[in-house]
A protein has these predicted regions:
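Extracellular/virion structural assembly segments
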Residues: 59-67, 71-95, 102-105, 192-201, ...
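Short, charged interaction patches at domain edges and termini
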Residues: 1-9, 53-61, 98-153, 184-199, ...
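Helix N-terminus capping/helix-initiation residues
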Residues: 12-13, 112, 210
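Small/polar-rich, solvent-exposed N-terminal microdomains that initiate assembly or binding
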Residues: 1-58, 79, 83, 87, ...
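Hydrophobic beta-strand residues in large extracellular and virion-surface proteins
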Residues: 6, 10, 50, 66-68, ...
Length: 286
């Protein structure tokens, strides 16, 4: 579905000078048809070919790259297409069954076999924002819900099922937040017969159009967490906040700006018991 979203997004840019193939603008996934293909209607250029490649990432499970190749016989049309494609895909989020963000890395000339064709390849890094669920209690989902209560107008990535293409600061919502778990281990609180304690380290990514907007949201959230020293889990039990730290960095989409550490308890399941049947006591003490 992401590939079809990217296709429709490029199509919506209405790039000038695109050829026509089978009645549609010459936009293709991975590879363009041969120049001799009967689907071409007149000229075979300009054209755009995109290639989205995803790979496993131990930290986030999925990441990858996006390459967009543009080829034109008119150098000025190529230059305009480069500008529009870079602007359209830099810091842009695509959300369907998976949410990804594309960030422009570089643009390089593309060598073509036809000397009359000018080509460029735009390279984009792809960062994935996978949805992970934790049972029986989910601190990620619980913190995301807590943040949504404080900031109802933000888009909580991974928590709201809605296909969308989004750029920070453009339209409503103008801000997105993503929560993920760094680690979960045995807690330092003593566990009991009724409850086991777990320590979780969570990260919060606030994606906005400016550092000032992000800092404002982070400041409010940090003050609230430090004041309350807890937030509610899905079952109403508390997540006890022990430490909150914030820092701006150059890799917001990867590391985020806030790290939170705390503990939560999970009630043990009561094992069913059965009474002993069929035993009769006879006789007595002598």
């Amino acid at each position: 579905m992401l590939n079809s979203m990217i296709y429709n997004y490029i199509k919506s840019l209405e790039l000038q000078g695109l050829a026509v193939h089978d009645g549609e603008p010459a936009i293709f996934e991975q590879q363009a048809p041969e120049d001799t293909d009967p689907g071409w209607e007149g000229m075979q250029y300009g054209r755009v070919v995109y290639d989205l490649r995803m790979q496993d990432d131990p930290a986030r499970k999925v990441s990858g790259s996006l390459r967009i190749m543009a080829a034109y016989t008119d150098a000025e049309e190529l230059k305009l297409a480069e500008h529009l494609l870079q602007e359209a895909f830099d810091r842009t989020f695509f959300s369907s069954d998976l949410t990804i963000a594309t960030t422009w890395q570089k643009t390089a000339p593309s060598v073509t076999s036809d000397m009359d064709v000018f080509g460029s390849i735009l390279y984009f890094d792809v960062e994935a924002f996978p949805v992970k669920r934790y049972v029986p209690l989910d601190p990620v989902r619980s913190l995301a819900g807590y943040i949504k209560d404080i900031f109802p107008d933000v888009w909580m990535i991974g928590q709201e099922e809605q296909a969308r293409i989004w750029k920070p600061g453009q339209g409503i919502p103008g801000t997105a937040v993503y929560v993920l778990m760094d680690s979960c281990s045995a807690g330092s609180f003593p566990s009991t017969y009724a409850c086991t304690w777990h320590m979780a380290v969570l990260r919060v990514l606030v994606i906005t159009a400016s550092y000032d907007e992000a800092n404002q949201i982070l400041g409010i959230l940090q003050a609230r967490l430090l004041e309350k020293e807890r937030f509610p889990m899905e079952d109403g039990s508390p997540f006890f906040v022990e430490r909150v730290s914030t820092a701006q960095n150059n890799d917001v989409l990867k590391r985020g700006q806030m790290q939170l550490q705390g503990q939560f308890g999970i009630l043990r399941e009561t094992e069913p018991t059965t009474s002993i049947q069929g035993i009769e006591m006879t006789g007595g003490w002598k």
